Amino acid sequence: MSDGQKTKTTVDIYGQQFTIVGDESKSHMRHVASIVDDKMREINEKNPYLDINKLAVLTAVNVVHDYLKLKEELERLKGQIKEKD
């Protein structure tokens, strides 16, 4: 959001309600929550005996891993573009 106002919305992640506040639109925050929920469910399918805390930490580790891979790919692509200029 560009006007400096905070947006507040309630989301459901892994069966729990969370109220989140941020600078982005409600739809963006819901999308983020949906990705977290999906990732938690995906990990839980492979590791059904994890308690909720371990599941949350493992989800965070996986999401950050994915983020870093994408960031590295972005830097690689930027380097390729720069070489062509």
Swiss-Prot record:
Its main location: cytoplasm. Gene3D superfamilies: 6.10.250.790. GO terms for cellular component: cell division site; cell septum; cytosol; plasma membrane. Keywords: Cell cycle, Cell division, Coiled coil, Cytoplasm, Septation. It comes from the Bacteria. Signal peptide: none annotated. GO terms for biological process: division septum assembly; FtsZ-dependent cytokinesis; septin ring assembly. It is found in: Cytoplasm. Residues 60-85 form a coiled coil. It holds the Pfam family ZapA. The keyword Magnesium does not apply. Belongs to the ZapA family. Type 2 subfamily. Activator of cell division through the inhibition of FtsZ GTPase activity, therefore promoting FtsZ assembly into bundles of protofilaments necessary for the formation of the division Z ring. It is recruited early at mid-cell but it is not essential for cell division. Homodimer. Interacts with FtsZ. This is Cell division protein ZapA. It comes from Bacillus licheniformis (strain ATCC 14580 / DSM 13 / JCM 2505 / CCUG 7422 / NBRC 12200 / NCIMB 9375 / NCTC 10341 / NRRL NRS-1264 / Gibson 46). The lineage of its organism: Bacteria, Bacillati, Bacillota, Bacilli, Bacillales. The gene is zapA.
